């Protein structure tokens, strides 16, 4: 599948699936499984960062470390912004209250596009990102 087809499938809501070891609820399809680093905001500062396996699905992003498994549904992420091609900042709600996290992963652009498609299709970064992804077949989203 080339980049243009992938972008169109994201717009249509029909995503390609990849094999994953994560047990997914019915109706959820894994799109990517990549390594990454997540930083959580606690109070006034950010933690040291934790290496995680990042699974992006049609409904959420799942972060799995050695000590925990966290699923963030698109409905729980209220705001997102790509800071770099591979760095995504998210703000949302967890079972313990409001939180923020930064996620560095090859799948940051895909994760952002899926979140935006579900929560904020008019996000100001979407048009330029889709245009750049369509023009650059070497983009991580096209792999």
Regions found by a protein language model. Name each.
Residues 1-53:
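Anionic N-terminal interaction surfaces
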Residues 7, 31-32, 64, 104-107:
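Alpha-helical protein-protein interaction elements
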Residues 49, 66-143:
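Acidic, Ser/Thr- and proline-rich intrinsically disordered linker/docking segments
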Residues 28, 37, 58-60, 69-72:
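Residue-level signal for functionally critical sites in structured catalytic/ligand-binding pockets
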Residues 14, 43, 59, 138-140:
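Generic, low-specificity signal for short hydrophobic/alpha-helical stretches with a mild N-terminal bias
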Residues 21-22, 62, 78:
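Residue-level recognition of well-ordered secondary-structure positions
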Residues 45-69:
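Conserved beta-hairpin
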């Amino acid at each position: 599948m080339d980049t243009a087809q992938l972008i169109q499938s994201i717009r249509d809501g029909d995503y390609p699936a990849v094999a994953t070891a994560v047990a997914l609820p019915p109706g959820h399809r894994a799109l990517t499984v990549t390594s990454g680093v997540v930083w959580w905001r606690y109070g006034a500062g950010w933690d040291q960062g934790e290496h995680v396996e990042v699974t992006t699905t049609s409904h959420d992003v799942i972060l799995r470390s050695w000590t925990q498994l966290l699923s963030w549904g698109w409905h729980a992420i209220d705001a997102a912004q790509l800071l770099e091609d591979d760095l995504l900042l998210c703000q949302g709600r967890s079972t313990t209250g409001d939180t923020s996290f930064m996620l560095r992963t090859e799948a940051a652009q895909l994760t952002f596009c899926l979140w935006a498609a579900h929560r904020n299709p008019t996000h100001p970064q979407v048009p330029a990102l889709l245009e750049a992804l369509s023009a650059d077949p070497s983009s991580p989203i096209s792999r």
